[in-house]
Amino acid sequence: MKKDAGLLFDFDIRVFDESEFHHWPKLPTDLKIKILEYIPFPTLRNFMFLSKDSYSLVTRLKTLVFNVSLSDIDNFKIKEVVVLLKEKKGRKYTYAGVRYNHSPRLVALATLFHFSTYMDIRETAMGLSALDPEEEHLLNVQPTTTVIAKDEFCIRAGASAIVSSFLRFLRPGCRLRVYPLREQKGFFLDTRFFDSVVVHASPAIDFDFTTGATDDQIVLFQCYDITMCVPNVTAKAINRIILEWLEGKREINVYALKGLGNVTKTEILQDVEVVPWEKFLTMIYNGDWWGLRLNQGEGTGLYNGARFLIVLVETDSCQLLDPYFCEK
């Protein structure tokens, strides 16, 4: 190529010979995987089923997926049609249905587990009213290495037993948010649930219903956020949590413990050095804001040399709040 004096840079374009072209099968595996990282997911999924080699490459890729949602659609009368593709042609609409021999819920769960084999799923949200024997069997036969959520797992369940079924598919360090599908008085997570390493390692737990967690279990939680109804937890455990925070061994953003059995501020703050409330308000930059919201004697201020903490105690509840708390 001739050099053009009008160009900002002088350069040559070299045309590759056909012999220098590298066909896909001859590329190194690492390079193939790198190329596949730039492929849109629909194309990637089609590529996946071209051959055994394609399937192996995609499953090794672990495509990053930020959120997967699974809806419980068993309330609908028609269970066969779960996907509708709609194309507008003038004023007419064309529908193409996808039919399955199994219930939509079973197919959705099977698809989720299939996705987990070649996707790096960060968050999963689901709503399940129930699990039938066939669906329970599907969960039971999944490999121990299966992970459906690494950062957050949110479930609205029709029965508390459903929640336990998914616990082994979560990565320790995953935020846990569990809600009854509807207002259910009998919704309860028993004591055994809180022996799980996944629960202990969770940075945030939101279980706004009655649980069977005990003193010995809750002190093992590594959460910075907890919302739980814990009738089996006593002032002794809360006192230990506060002492660990004072020693810098625990991070607290918001702890909202409800359903406690007649706890007192004296028991909770035993052996704890308290900062006088008026002085505490001058130590935090938003002291005026807290001063307007809490009357003298309602809040107790603590300082561990690096962070501040507000303790609020009522007969059946206790809140531990970082005055600068934020939604994490």
Where is each model-derived feature located?
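Non-core capping and flanking segments associated with repeat-based/extracellular domains
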Residues: 1-328
